[in-house]
Amino acid sequence: MLRVRSHIWQQHRLLSLSLCRKNVQLSSSISNLFEKHNITVTEDEIKHDFNEPILTHLKRRGLVENCVNEEELIKDAETRKLGLYCGADPTAKSLHLGNLLPLMVLLHFNLRGHNVYPLIGGATGEVGDPSGRSTERSAMANNVRLDHINRISGQLSNFFRKATDYGKTRNPEIATLEIGSQELKNNKEWWKDMGMLEFLAIYGKHIRVNQMLSRESIKNRLQSEQGIGFNEFTYQILQAYDFYYLNNTYGVDIQVGGNDQYGNIVAGIDLIGRLRKAEESKNQNQSYGITVPLLTTSNGVKFGKSAGNAIFIDKALTSSYDVYQFMYNTTDEDIKRFLYKFSLLPTKTIDKVVDVHNTDKKSRFGQRVLAIEMCDLIHGDGEGFSNYIISEILFSKVNIKENFKADEILNAFDKQGLVSSVSKTDLASTNIVNLLYKINEGEKSKSELKRMVKGGSVYIGNTKEGKVTDAEYLIDIEKDAIESKLLLLKLGKKYNVVRID
């Protein structure tokens, strides 16, 4: 019955694709930039990605390093609805860019109708995963761990909600498809009532110590001077049981993780097989594992907390503007790789972006697209365009009136809390010195502001033609403001964005 429904779901997917228009309109967040460079997104580009087997597509995007039971998975993913999960332990306040790769795998499957179960390690986080570590993790206070759990749970939920909405703006077909379910889980749910004796009695006999000792992460720690504690040694058992529990309870078929999780994933698949045999289970569906590559730059630099260059997805830790600037500074060699991994633009469209970028690398067109895409993926559609506007005004010296609407500018700076307001009445009777004093809330004295005006450090707009040297100058709304709604003032290196009420 499940396979029949899945076949109908597949037919619906292909039928909806056939209804595409020749040229597809994307969100204004990215289409404005595309139009300037004559880039269009066509029906064929969208079909190309959606007609491709999901695993083949993910490999082409550079999101798959290894796959357990690959041939069976390729067939299964096209004939039935699967369940996938990946876990995140609460070792920090926020997920970071490196954590997004397994989430992107889940997202691609989810947008094609498969169910996903992002998992927060409320229980396993108390133990500590030794994978990829040469030393034992420091103990964490319980209240700190609970705070991390709450934060990361919210981040996981927000990511899938915002990324799904973002996907619909980059590929209109996504809006016509039946997207799979998204259900956040915490493994504390099934571990809190599990006693040690109960676990050993029921499951211990199905776990092989020789296999545990053969894991690379375990061997490395055993050979180290510090060794390994029993808590971290048994972590792989806990992760294996998580996979079994999710498989048995929610029909989760695939575990996704970093490449250092390969051994733990295989242990879970092995445990599922052993327990099914012991329980004489009628469920004969294959279980799978997918690992993602380590996220690095083209010159091999890692991303993450330990590397000291983590870009967090929590706005309180890394603002969306900082995300934009970080991606804007990406090297030319990394643009295609990162767009393939983190953007939901059709891959053929990405190829067009890269081709246009390569004709004039100094324009940094590719970096702008990447920065917009990353912001919209993490923080929601429109976030990237807002940061693009801010960046262009602050650094590119574009003609503001010709390139942006007043409402676009106000919205962009408002998101960063950088907009002041002044009434038309006050504006008409307030000279430039008093205006700057008011909107900067007395940050500088009036005498200091007067010296800056006379010294040529004050501009209206972002061009040299807007220099003001008369301390008694009164703003002319028709001449100085944008659409009579917005006034942009530059005081030294600082910009003031003023809404005219």
Stretch-by-stretch model annotation:
Residues M1-S18:
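N-terminal chloroplast transit peptides
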Residues L2, E189-W191, V369:
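An N-terminal domain-start capping segment
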Residues I8, E65, E71, M104, ...:
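A broad, structure-centric signal for solvent-exposed, well-ordered loop/edge residues
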Residues I8, S18-C20, S29-S31, T425, ...:
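Serine/proline-rich low-complexity intrinsically disordered segments, especially terminal tails, linkers
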Residues I8-W9, V24-L26, I30, F34, ...:
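Extended hydrophobic/Leu-rich segments
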